[in-house]
């Protein structure tokens, strides 16, 4: 691109570089800065950025696996499947979102298995983790809300308020000023007009979201390579087997509906959160890349990429967290 076309972002002008919070690219920036200090070529600098991004992803992935009480192998499997490994070794932020989501799920599972109330430092760390997820992409931070459903025996109301407070303060002090002054997002259509169309026809908009989600799920069977379809089927079967084993070993028979919901609250939450996160990024793509007014009633949103689903995968492991209310300490059999 000619230098005359490069836009330096400030209070009045923005470009593609500030579509994301600056700290989102800190892993890549570390590698690039080191490469610049040792006078490597521009190409080598980009490769160094990829390497540093991969290293930090691996560190956070190992932390999530170590923190998870059980089913560590399943978490490791999710973190190394080819699509995730690809984005983790690229310059994109998707790999870090996967790692942060995995750490959040592992932290919730570990807290649920505690025999005492979570400490204040751990609460602060959990709030920072939720803030980091929200800074990456707000839709992927929905999983952090699952912490509010932890039993009071391990996370009291006060701790939950502190958790929300830490995340809110960080958002207000660090993220919101940047968002107001510098944040921007590219769009091929008039987003304001799309919003008015969506609000005027909510049922049709919801229908487009649902159809786009179904299309995204069935796309593997028709367009992607066979190995990708096989991998997806294997992952689903492994998760279902782990879920059946967990339910069977925790005795779910002959329970009142209220007791069942309390015991398997995180299974319900995992399915709801996963659907909400997918619907959120589908809606975002629909609002920014599609003209809702000119779309047919049964059309699907264009521009949805499969990599958007990858950060949702760790959320399903949240469904393996089981709350045992038979003891005062309320433990969890997490994956």
Predicted regions and their residues:
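Interfacial juxtamembrane loops and adjacent helix segments
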Residues: 1-47, 294-295
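Transmembrane-helix signature of polytopic, membrane-embedded enzymes
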Residues: 40-43, 62-82
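Specific aromatic-rich, kink-prone transmembrane helix
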Residues: 63, 98-115, 126-129, 316
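Membrane-interface alpha helices of multi-pass inner-membrane proteins
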Residues: 86, 120-138, 143-152
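Short acidic/glycine- and proline-prone juxtamembrane loop motifs at membrane-interface regions
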Residues: 90-97
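Perimembrane helix-loop-helix junctions
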Residues: 107-117, 141-169
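Hydrophobic alpha-helical membrane-interfacial segments at the cytosolic entry of transmembrane helices
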Residues: 122-130, 156-181, 266-276
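Membrane-lumen/periplasm interface segments of multi-pass, membrane-embedded glycan/lipid transferases
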Residues: 164, 168, 175-256
């Amino acid at each position: 691109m000619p230098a005359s076309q490069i836009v330096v972002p400030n209070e009045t002008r923005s470009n593609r570089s500030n579509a994301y919070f600056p700290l989102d690219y800190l892993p890549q920036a570390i590698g690039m800065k080191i490469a610049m200090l040792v006078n490597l070529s521009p190409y080598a600098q980009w490769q160094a950025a990829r390497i540093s991004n991969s290293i930090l992803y691996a560190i956070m992935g190992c932390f999530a696996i170590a923190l998870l009480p059980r089913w560590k192998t399943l978490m490791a499997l999710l973190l190394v499947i080819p699509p995730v490994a690809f984005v983790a070794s690229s310059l994109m932020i998707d790999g870090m979102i996967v790692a942060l989501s995995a750490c959040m799920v592992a932290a919730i599972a570990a807290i649920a298995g505690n025999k005492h109330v979570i400490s204040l430092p751990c609460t602060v760390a959990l709030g920072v983790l939720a803030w980091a997820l929200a800074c990456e992409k707000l839709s992927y931070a929905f999983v952090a809300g699952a912490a509010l459903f932890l039993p009071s025996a391990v996370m009291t109301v006060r701790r939950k308020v502190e958790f929300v407070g830490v995340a809110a303060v960080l958002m207000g002090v660090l993220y919101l000023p940047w968002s107001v002054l510098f944040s921007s997002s590219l769009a091929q259509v008039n987003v304001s007009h799309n919003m008015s169309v969506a609000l005027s026809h909510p049922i049709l908009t919801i229908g487009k979201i649902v159809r786009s989600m179904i299309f995204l799920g069935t796309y593997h069977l028709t367009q992607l390579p066979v190995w990708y379809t096989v991998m997806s089927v294997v992952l689903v079967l492994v998760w279902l087997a782990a879920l059946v084993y967990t339910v069977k070993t925790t005795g779910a028979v002959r329970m009142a509906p209220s007791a069942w919901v309390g015991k398997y609250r995180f299974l319900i939450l995992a399915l709801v959160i996963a659907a909400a996160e997918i619907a959120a990024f589908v809606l975002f793509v629909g609002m920014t890349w599609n003209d809702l007014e000119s779309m047919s009633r049964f059309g699907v949103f264009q521009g949805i990429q499969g990599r958007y689903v990858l950060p949702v995968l760790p959320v399903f492991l949240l469904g393996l967290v089981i709350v045992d209310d038979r003891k005062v300490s309320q433990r969890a059999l997490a994956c």
